[in-house]
């Protein structure tokens, strides 16, 4: 077996969309029931991918505006971002392109982004929408459209509570780092070359 490769994976997105729960669900197979806003936290997990051991460094960030100046400090050296929004929060969905993409392009240009829709278990929960009349569910088609708009290689919906697709989120993050998608070659206009010295 080869030496382990370190991959730094940073979660970003609005506060309370479920970033920390997704990390805890992935690393410990449990679901925390209390909401405690994250300041910054790190997790580490050894994962075997195609016979290679990967040390996946998971960096959790705070989405609240109070941390706008501090949060980008965790972006340095990132190999991949998990950009999360809640499937039951239109505001968090809209902030992907309004807030998070501009921030990531400014502080970490060129780093791949996996778009993640969280709280999948609540999207089809009729009682949730009765109890929260202002909540608007985000469809899979809307998520795919946003993925195309921001140029993310993957869009994955998951539920940390039921663990549905949680592993898939992190598998995609590892895959995009180990096997980056081929960049489309830009066609250069064929013209006669002329140099003036």
Curated annotation (Swiss-Prot):
Annotated propeptide span(s): 195-197
Annotated localization: Cytoplasm; Membrane
Primary localisation category: cytoplasm
SMART domains: RAB, RAS, RHO
Lipid attachment locations (S-geranylgeranyl cysteine): 194
Name the record gives this protein: Rac-like GTP-binding protein 6
Organism (species): Oryza sativa subsp. japonica (Rice)
Membrane topology type: Peripheral membrane protein
Annotated function: Inactive GDP-bound Rho GTPases reside in the cytosol, are found in a complex with Rho GDP-dissociation inhibitors (Rho GDIs), and are released from the GDI protein in order to translocate to membranes upon activation.
One example of a Gene Ontology biological process annotation: cortical cytoskeleton organization
Motif extent (Effector region): 35-43
Keyword annotations: Cytoplasm, GTP-binding, Lipoprotein, Membrane, Methylation, Nucleotide-binding, Prenylation
Gene: RAC6
Residues carrying Cysteine methyl ester: 194
